Amino acid sequence: MPKTNRAQPGRLSSRFWRLLGASTEKNRSRSLTLVTDSSEYDDEAAGLTDEQLRKAAGLLNLEDLAESEDIPQFLAIAREAAERATGLRPFDVQLLGALRMLAGDVIEMATGEGKTLAGAIAAAGYVLAGRHVHVVTINDYLARRDAEWMGPLIEAMGLTVGWITAESSSEERRAAYGCDVTYASVNEIGFDVLRDQLVTDVADLVSPNPDVALIDEADSVLVDEALVPLVLAGTTHRETPRLEIIKLVGELEAGTDYDTDADSRNVHLTDVGARKVEKALGGIDLYSEEHVGTTLTEVNVALHAHVLLQRDVHYIVRDDAVHLINASRGRIAQLQRWPDGLQAAVEAKEGIETTETGEVLDTITVQALINRYATVCGMTGTALAAGEQLRQFYKLGVSPIPPNKPNIREDEADRVYITAAAKNDAIVEHIIEVHETGQPVLVGTRDVAESEELHERLLRRGVPAVVLNAKNDAEEAQVIAEAGKFGVVTVSTQMAGRGTDIRLGGSDEADHDRVAELGGLHVVGTGRHHTERLDNQLRGRAGRQGDPGSSVFFSSWEDDVVAANLDRNKLPMETDPETGDGRIVSPKAAGLLDHAQRVAEGRMLDVHANTWRYNQLIAQQRAIIVDRRNTLLRTATAREELAELAPKRYRELADEIPEERLETICRHIMLYHLDRGWADHLAYLADIRESIHLRALGRQNPLDEFHRLAVDAFASLAADAIEAAQQTFETANVLEDEPGLDLSKLARPTSTWTYMVNDNPLSDDTLSTLSLPGVFR
């Protein structure tokens, strides 16, 4: 069999690779050479039976991936296995992508270039090197789809593969985690980690020790979702915000009673508004010690819900429930909610019964979850724009992978208008003009409200457009699959993470040539996002695999990204008087949009960094708790410590009951009070954070104060938990007919559930780090 003739990976300068934080020149050159060398083994691999192919994979020496001489053989075996198992023969660029992930990089591969296949090959490579791999996806659908799609390839190399979704039982989860490669959403992996913190027997553990995380849509998971806390809650009774305050805030007037900043990220009472609220609540002083951490906090939360959070932008209401919208993905954020007070305030604002939230038993951010893994790598279509965050927060490099075929998509410069109204009119006319030719059009909008308004306008003009947003995301795969069909107009919210490719001519590509002759898929953006990555994700839907395509973005000086980041008085306002359409003719317009977007990205990076420093303290404290809990769960430490703390009681029980049962009792008691203390600590931290910004009134740095209070409280948590365990041990009713505390009183919550918190991203406070003292022996 002759060498496979594939397009050679493109060339990038060594300096450029170093700037990306990727591999050294030596390793980069080695990757390119290894891909080329692998073709020499294609004939040999093709001549093997399926069984021989599996055995050959198992005989590879990949223990040292950086130095192994068997990499070319591995790539040849993987290429042959992929073609047999999936019908897809990997291109050289896909093998290059797999190698860069095996080197620990995040790769950037354009939409339609085959990231899923490259990821499966990389996962197999890690396993053959003796590692265990979690392929982390952004939702359950992709986890199951990719596991079933790529499973035959992984199994063809003699390895096992499993997948996990929200419906998976504990037994199914253990079985899936026991496989060599496990596909699961970041949510489910996190929830399993949290649920394991409630078990009192090692046999009940589900989640294994983290080893390799190979992350699909890496920028979405590692950047956009990084600070989202995953939460484990248990049944309890908690007070909801007072309805009188929520109703009162709803009657306040903008500009008189409250003000917002330029980009509507913050809202605050004016002096007039504060006096109005104080009078309505019986003449209280909102800023007195009695009310500053309670009533004022309730008012601020209600004000946030009423003013800043908009229906069909930040959330939708469906089936008498508030559903949050994930802005970076354009779909409902399943199992996600705001912090309790804010969630209740929004529900009250919409006239919906407040949902039960319970008591937070444990929490972990996505960033802290991923940082548990010894090795992290990933793939996405837009890694370069997230390179700074990936380096700063994960120490990850980025490797751009050139396309298999040259990208011939034509990207037109932004069309910029003075007003949003003029822009929207121009968008409708442009879509109609293109639609009349039969060329398929994909329109990317920034939120649900905008998508529905544009959809209605198109329908009124006789354009049979299809809309896809958070309200009908169950139809996602079908709608996206047909978006490249002749004459189809699709209006969609954010395209990130929509795993279905758009093929010219429809899912069956029946009209591929006809659509290609018209110019392929035409993408229209209704405005710049706050980050270039999201714009590029939309553009990247056109021009797949060397197909023709085009894109154009429409913007206005009234768009959010401009209004918040540029001085309107310095913007060019010249338009063409002959057209009268309000379009800016200045050549500086596109450059100003780029500048506004860079400013927005810089602000978001600052917010991420500051919020990370806040969350880092909690992550450090949680790590100490987890370490202590594992020690109690897996060793005889609980029995030994209680024997030392209460020797008389211990000897009394040791004479009456078997040592194994006594050890179980000691472990149960110690774990209960440790978990109880941690839950109380989390509640305390939540209460502090609700009002910590008010410390600025006393000229204190709010988050420095948060750190001080959190560290002080954590130091006492250990002593309090041990003391409580000692008291329980000495008074518990262990022996038959013995008076004292019934151990059944230490029961765990009768029910638990998990959810994600869309934490308040509007704070941009700064904080400094404080060291954590050793709190457990």
Curated annotation (Swiss-Prot):
Protein name from the UniProt record: Protein translocase subunit SecA 2
Localization per Swiss-Prot or TrEMBL: Cell membrane; Cytoplasm
Residues given in the record as ATP binding sites: 94, 112-116, 501
InterPro entries registered for this protein in UniProt: Helicase_ATP-bd (IPR014001), Helicase_C-like (IPR001650), P-loop_NTPase (IPR027417), SecA (IPR000185), SecA_Actinobact-type (IPR026389), SecA_CS (IPR020937), SecA_DEAD (IPR011115), SecA_motor_DEAD (IPR014018)
PROSITE patterns to which the protein is assigned, alphabetical: SECA, SECA_MOTOR_DEAD
HAMAP family recorded: SecA
GO biological processes: intracellular protein transmembrane transport; protein import; protein targeting; protein transport by the Sec complex
Topology of the protein relative to the lipid bilayer: Peripheral membrane protein
Any one Gene Ontology molecular-function term assigned to this protein's record: protein-exporting ATPase activity
Gene Ontology, cellular component aspect: cell envelope Sec protein transport complex; cytosol; plasma membrane
Stated family: Belongs to the SecA family.
Top EC category: translocase
Catalytic activity of the protein: ATP + H2O + cellular proteinSide 1 = ADP + phosphate + cellular proteinSide 2
Keyword terms, alphabetized: ATP-binding, Cell membrane, Cytoplasm, Membrane, Nucleotide-binding, Protein transport, Translocase, Translocation, Transport
PANTHER family linked to this entry: CHLOROPLAST PROTEIN-TRANSPORTING ATPASE, SECA INNER MEMBRANE COMPONENT OF SEC PROTEIN SECRETION SYSTEM
CDD domains noted in UniProt: DEXDc_SecA (cd17928), SF2_C_secA (cd18803)
Record field: transmembrane: none
Source organism per UniProt: Mycolicibacterium paratuberculosis (strain ATCC BAA-968 / K-10)
Signal sequence coordinates: none
